[in-house]
Design a protein with these regions (language model features):
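Helix-to-beta-strand junctions that scaffold the AdoMet/dcAdoMet cofactor pocket
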Residues: 12, 42-43, 56-57
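Conserved SAM-binding loop
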Residues: 3-4
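A short SAM/SAH-binding and catalytic strip from SAM-dependent methyltransferases
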Residues: 31-46
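Conserved SAM-binding strand-loop segment of SAM-dependent methyltransferases
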Residues: 10-23
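A short glycine-rich, Lys/Arg-flanked "PGG" loop and its adjoining helix->strand segment in the class I
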Residues: 46-59
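C-terminal alpha-helical "lid/dimerization" subdomain adjacent to the S-adenosyl-L-methionine
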Residues: 65-121
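A short acidic, Gly/Pro-enriched loop at the edge of an enzyme's catalytic core
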Residues: 21-33
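Core SAM-dependent methyltransferase catalytic element
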Residues: 117-142
Length: 142
């Protein structure tokens, strides 16, 4: 794998590892798990949330970065929201629908729905850590 070779060349191979696994099958215990623009593409985001929770240390954090969206369609009728809706219709929803469960959140799920997904996976606390016109960053704790 090229990543391993680059790590070796960079002198960090003994400190890092590269694994390939699905979001519901990765192994290990972590202080931090980070998802970037992907939870809405997953067919079973609740199952994924439950797996992430099981992989976190008791004081661990799950950082979820998702496309920014309001909770109501009317909140997203702006140039960025329209682009996100069109991309989501063509890419995100079909990808999720083709997977196990097929929840099809789409890129415009909105903060309330994302919180519901995360809490349904067993997390007890979710807070908005940051937001821009393009991204929403949520911090979830077991």
């Amino acid at each position: 794998m090229r990543a391993r070779e680059l790590a070796r060349q960079g002198g960090v191979a003994e400190r890092i590892a590269f694994e390939r696994a699905t979001a519901k099958e990765f192994s290990g215990t972590y202080d931090l798990v980070a998802f970037f623009d992907c939870l809405h593409d997953m067919g079973d985001p609740i199952g994924v949330a439950a797996h992430v929770k099981s992989a976190l240390k008791l004081d661990g954090t799950w950082m979820v970065v998702e496309p920014f969206a309001g909770d109501r369609i009317a909140d997203n009728l702006n140039p960025i929201g329209r682009i996100f809706y069109s991309a989501s219709t063509q890419i995100c929803v079909p990808a999720s629908s083709a997977q196990e469960v097929g929840l099809a959140l789409g890129a415009q799920a909105g903060e309330t729905r994302l919180r519901e997904i995360i809490m349904s996976g067993g997390f007890s606390r979710v807070r908005r850590a940051a937001a821009t016109p393009f991204n929403l960053v949520l911090e979830a704790r077991p």
